[in-house]
Structures are given as C-alpha cells and as structure tokens.
C-alpha cells in the first residue's frame, strides 16, 4: 500500500512539474513575442523620424537652398509624416482588435454591396498604375459579419494586390458561397511571394521584400490586421503565390456567426 501511495504521489508530482514547466514555457514564448513586437514597433516608428531629421538637417545647414530642392525635400518629409501616421493608425487598429476580440458588431450584411463599395474606393488608386480591377459575383450573398472589420480585411488584400502589382496589371476579386460559407478571392498579376516567405506574411511587421518596402509603402501590419479580422469571424485565410506570377488570397467566412 505504501509503495502504491508513493508511486501515485511521485506520478502526481511529476504531472504537476510537467504542467508547471509547460506553463513557464508558454509564458517565455509570450514574453519573447512581446519583446520582439515592442522592438519592431520602436524600429518602425524611429525610421520615418530619422529620415525626416536627415532631410530637415540638410535644409537647415545649406544657405540659399534652391526652391526646387526645398520643394523636393518638403515633399519627402510630408511622405515620411504620412508613413508615420499610417504605422500609428495600423498599430491602434491591432490593439483595438486585440481588446475587442469578443465584441464584434454582428449584423446582416449584403456582401456583394460591401465588395462594390470597397472597389469603388480603391479604383482611383489602381488607375494611377493603370491596373484593371474586376469584380465577379457568382451569387447574391448575405452574411452575419462585422461590416467595419470585414471591410478592413478585404480592403487590405485589395490594396496589397494593387501596391505589389505591375503597371497595367490586373486585380480580380470574386465572391461565391455554399450553404455554410462565403468565399472571397483576391488575385493579382503582381510580383508574387516566394515560398519561404509565405508562412510568415501574416506576422506583424513582416515584409517579403525589405529592400523595396519603403518605396512601395505599407507598414507590414496590413495582413496581420486582415488575419485577425478573419479569425474573429471564425473564418480562414489561405495564400497561393509564385514569384512574378501573381498571388491569390482566399478568405472563407461562415454565413452565420456563432459566438463561443
């Protein structure tokens, strides 16, 4: 009896020890993730400020700056201010989503109309690069979604499809549904995503082409925001891409929202 009790006590102690070690491991992962995020935020916020300082210092130290150079530098400073503002806005969006993960504003939404409005807003941006945007709706779709968050998710995908595309390219958006889900596909004729990067593109601040990220624009937060919004709807998002052959994102969302 004593041996059995001793064995049971040993087993229970080992189980408690294993559970405690697992908990410590999870806490370390969370802590490391938090430290990395803070480090990334600091770096991203400092970069536009550093650029603005260099430009401003150049203007201050020169006598009789030519008006053309002055205008060019001020234009560059304005772009860096816009970039800083975009980063802050995207960070606030992510923080807000983390805090309100359980507070979706669910309503019956006509998804066809939603996509029409998104593309109407983004067409002028596409026209600057002579990119054609095509919408193909296979059927009328009404779903229980948070209209604001879903608009944000789809808008980010279409904006990326325009941003990382070639001039005179195309963006194709399609909507379909079955008895349980609706599906939005966003395809483009753009630069594509290398296979080794595809597992990381939804991470915060991850950029596929870091050498061109500043000239193309973007904060590295758009796809993280999209993924958050999709997951909050109990949905899924997948990517298929080949370098220089374009990219397709497929979003699947339940027609009826089920809270847990």
Model-derived regions: residue spans:
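Short beta-strand/loop element within the Bergerat-fold HATPase_c
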Residues: 168-180
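Membrane-proximal HAMP signal-relay module
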Residues: 1-38, 53-65, 74-75, 82, ...
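Acidic ATP/Mg2+-coordinating residue in the GHKL
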Residues: 188
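Short conserved segment of the HATPase_c
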Residues: 193-207
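Short flexible loop/turn segments at helix-to-beta-strand junctions
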Residues: 99-109, 113, 144
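Conserved catalytic submotifs in the C-terminal HATPase_c
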Residues: 105-108, 127-128, 132-142
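Short helix-loop "hinge" at the ATP-lid/N-box region of the Bergerat-fold HATPase_c
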Residues: 161-162
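Short alpha-helical segment within the cytosolic histidine kinase core of two-component systems
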Residues: 116-128
């Amino acid at each position: 009896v004593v041996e059995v009790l001793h064995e049971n006590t040993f087993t229970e102690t080992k189980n408690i020890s294993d559970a405690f070690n697992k908990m410590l491991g999870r806490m370390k992962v969370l802590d490391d993730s938090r430290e990395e995020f803070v480090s990334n935020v600091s770096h991203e916020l400092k970069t536009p400020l550093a650029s603005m300082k260099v430009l401003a210092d150049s203007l201050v130290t020169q006598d009789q700056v030519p008006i053309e150079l002055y205008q060019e530098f001020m234009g560059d400073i304005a772009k860096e201010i816009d970039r800083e503002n975009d980063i802050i806005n995207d960070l606030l969006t992510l923080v807000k989503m983390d805090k309100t993960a359980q507070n979706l504003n669910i309503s019956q939404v006509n998804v066809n109309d939603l996509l029409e409005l998104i593309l109407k807003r983004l067409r002028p941006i596409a026209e600057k690069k002579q990119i054609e945007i095509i919408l193909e709706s296979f059927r009328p779709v009404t779903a229980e979604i948070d209209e604001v968050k879903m608009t944000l998710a789809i808008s980010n995908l279409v904006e990326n499809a325009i941003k990382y595309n070639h001039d005179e390219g195309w963006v194709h958006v399609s909507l379909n549904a079955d008895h349980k889900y609706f599906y939005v596909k966003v395809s483009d004729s753009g630069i594509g995503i290398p296979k080794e990067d595809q597992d990381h593109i939804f991470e915060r601040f991850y950029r596929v082409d870091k050498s061109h990220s500043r000239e193309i624009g973007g904060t590295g937060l758009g796809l993280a925001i999209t993924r958050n919004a999709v997951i909050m709807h109990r949905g899924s998002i997948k990517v298929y891409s080949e370098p220089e052959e374009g990219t397709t994102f497929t979003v699947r969302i339940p027609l009826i929202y089920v809270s847990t």
